């Protein structure tokens, strides 16, 4: 089996029918013409935010990570492992793709521990066992994995989806693409930066050009590139016609170098 490709979905993608249609059409095209197995990893911040708003619950973030109190983890699990995951499975079904919905704890695919007590039920993801997902891939299934995990003590944890995707890529020896709303990392003039090193990223963070959630994304991509020992791409789902080329390893967004 070829080494898999993990496509991490983020941003408002889950909220946009047009975006999902583009993505799944590209996945169908890719799967028809390539043997390479694919895995989807997703968060669903927008789904969680909508639900929290509807329930009048505050959304609090610390350094770009969502604070998850004990009384909110069940709600967030329902939004990510439930609504967001099953929405993606429904789109796969609509496009005749045989998909299986999972969370990080299934088959112990990604090991999760509590990151920081101050953040509550927020997990740190580390590589686990490739056995379950490899079995699914060998049988032609598309695993769709939410970023909810569980500790050895049985505590549910909300994991940053970029970091979850990195841990799963390390588990499977997979390549990784982080798909988001933006076409990559932008410089101070709004122009896409084609390649990024750790030194360049540090410089742009110091200058205030890379901020907030993008800092988490860039650090996750740098961490992924270091962990995996190979480049990681940050790119946009908006240009559907470019997605098959992107899945084939053509740089379309910002390539994070080791």
Swiss-Prot record:
GO molecular function: acetylglutamate kinase activity; ATP binding
Top-level taxon of the source organism: Bacteria
Disulphides: none
UniProt KW ATP-binding keyword: yes
GO biological process terms on file: arginine biosynthetic process via ornithine; L-arginine biosynthetic process
EC annotation from Swiss-Prot or TrEMBL: 2.7.2.8
Pathway: Amino-acid biosynthesis; L-arginine biosynthesis; N(2)-acetyl-L-ornithine from L-glutamate: step 2/4
InterPro entries: AceGlu_kinase-like_sf (IPR036393), AcgluKinase_fam (IPR004662), ArgB (IPR037528), Asp/Glu/Uridylate_kinase (IPR001048), NAGK-NC (IPR041731)
GO cellular component: cytoplasm
Keywords of this entry: Amino-acid biosynthesis, Arginine biosynthesis, ATP-binding, Cytoplasm, Kinase, Nucleotide-binding, Transferase
Residues that span the membrane, as ranges: none
Quaternary organization: Homodimer.
Family of this protein: Belongs to the acetylglutamate kinase family. ArgB subfamily.
Name of the molecule in the record: Acetylglutamate kinase
Species per Swiss-Prot/TrEMBL record: Shigella dysenteriae serotype 1 (strain Sd197)
